[in-house]
């Protein structure tokens, strides 16, 4: 399909006048039938890279996603725009699943979102063969790599897709992956001479800061105070931590609520919607929050505890400032976090998992303790060269370094 048609589809379905960097080239490669590897940081517009080609071509595109809530959000948005999309997952009752499968048999859909464990069932694979998919897109593709920060064993089975579906083009997408993880994704999925697209990890509007944690509540309130009425996310490492902090913030006059995987789905959804509508100023969350959250005006992200790895930290801070305006990313650092994280790592049964987790934590600690430009340390981790001498935004570039205890 010629580019002008893609542009009109971009406008009519998604409401955009122009592509973001790399999107058009990725879409052209997909429509040419190539395997494609996409590394695009959070907020760069990854989803469009498989959604638009799916709508531009005949037949069905399969989208593998590990996140049930995100599946529903994306399908709802596509359906609202008039795009024929559906999902199959464990939230559907038997009758609704049958209805959707019937629609797939009749060719009524162009996009099917499905979790990896459902996709790899033999019954699903037999149906897929009869639906003759034109492309398989694998979102969060870093989950296939044992060297990544979010390895999921069910993703490993996706390696069989190439054997089962032969020459069907595949697109692997991720927001964060080191060189080693990228190579592992290509190898595990058996991508054949893939077109590789790597967007820049540089977010010049984000002002990274690491400060010694002394009184977490007081320090969190100080950051919120600088952002009067503006939206922010505070990440905590435990579910209890999110609830305690949200309660303390409310006592101090801040509209805040918790978000974690232990809450029931309705309460989580309610808090998420309230945050997006600006009825809440602050969400106190575990890493369960944020995947696919489309809120461009988050002005600050605070990490009350040390994250387990730099990939996760980069992705979570990347939820700030998606509108391109400046935003603060503050990490409260205390050496006791390292001891605690190390204890969790040593409880893992698998020695390889322990070794990878130790290495990832070590790199996170290096970032926290570094006197170098924060942007440089982050970009270096993702093998991207930072050309500037000084980012003129992070604490290390703007002010002398305080020594940690």
Walk through the language-model features, giving the residues of each:
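Helicase motor core with emphasis on the C-terminal RecA-like subdomain
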Residues: 2-13, 17-21, 25-47, 55-57, ...
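Cys/His-rich short segments
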Residues: 360, 365, 369-405
